[in-house]
């Protein structure tokens, strides 16, 4: 999949608008995982019963921008190709973050 090359702040605004309108996104892998989404005080909260004991996983604006900027330079984006690029603090969030980027249109099929 190809990532739209937007400035990180603009990408955050795009994701924010998507989460305001939509309360979920689906995983892109073979497992049919649905992530519940909430936007609370400049953070995106992901929730899925099969991850993190059903507790919210939280990505702040700063974390999102760090994640987005770390994957901007590669041609093909998926959970495997970004393994070495994503900061350690966001490594576990690769799958829900890619699902969110795909759902909001920032990540498109090649």
Sequence positions of predicted segments:
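Long, low-complexity, charged/polar intrinsically disordered regions in eukaryotic proteins
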Residues: 1-62
């Amino acid at each position: 999949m190809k990532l739209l090359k937007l400035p990180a702040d603009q990408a955050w605004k795009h994701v924010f608008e998507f989460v305001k309108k939509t309360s979920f996104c689906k995983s892109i892998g073979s497992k049919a995982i649905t992530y519940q989404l909430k936007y609370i005080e400049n953070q995106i909260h992901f929730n899925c019963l099969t991850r993190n004991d059903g507790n919210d996983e939280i990505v702040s604006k700063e974390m999102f921008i760090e994640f987005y900027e770390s994957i901007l330079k590669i041609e093909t984006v998926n959970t495997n190709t970004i393994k070495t690029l994503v900061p350690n603090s966001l490594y576990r969030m690769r799958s829900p973050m890619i699902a969110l980027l795909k759902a909001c249109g920032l990540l498109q099929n090649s």
